């Protein structure tokens, strides 16, 4: 690997340990989607002084806190990857918090029709047409992937599911701020500070962050800018 890099070439290897121990590599990205492989590779990379970008949300929700601490002790960075729903949601949350707004609920729109009892055998043809593994496709359909991504957001922010499995209402983009809010205000939540998802039209494949504030001037500006009421 080092020789290829020094010659300006692209190196391909079947041994991740070689990548983790390369003297010419500063940052590694894990996009395997396999928690076992991701955890082992990240630990090896961190032990060898590499920064780790974890595009493997399955590994991140399982052992991410440990990897983050291991990276801190080693003086390197462990981080998620921008672009996917958890990171995009975190960007909204961070922006809202920087404005002094209180987070009511944050999450994503589910991309696929929700079918809790979906099994790979039922989706082999569709998976073939979409060039996907049937098992992975079913993870998107049965809600597993959505649950995993919400755990990633919860681990990073301290926001929590309001109920096991979350509510997952069929709220449209325009209805989100009327549904995923506390019951005392006409919504479905028992408290503020939650993660959840919607299967309503106009939300997927996007993310959302519902906020509130007690500050009169901020309330006035949100209403004036037509982003709140």
What are these regions (language model features)?
Residues 1-44, 48:
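N-terminal glycine-/serine-/threonine-rich beta1-alpha1-beta2 phosphate-ribose binding loop
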Residues 125-229:
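C-terminal catalytic/substrate-binding lobe primarily of soluble NAD(P)-dependent oxidoreductases
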Residues 50, 75-76, 101, 159:
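Short glycine/serine/threonine/alanine-rich loop segments
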Residues 14, 23, 37, 62, ...:
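Conserved active-site and cofactor/substrate-binding residues in soluble primary-metabolism enzymes
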Residues 32-48, 55-84, 90, 94:
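Rossmann-fold NAD(P)-binding glycine/threonine-rich loop
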Residues 71-72, 79-145:
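Rossmann-like NAD(P)H-binding beta-loop-alpha module
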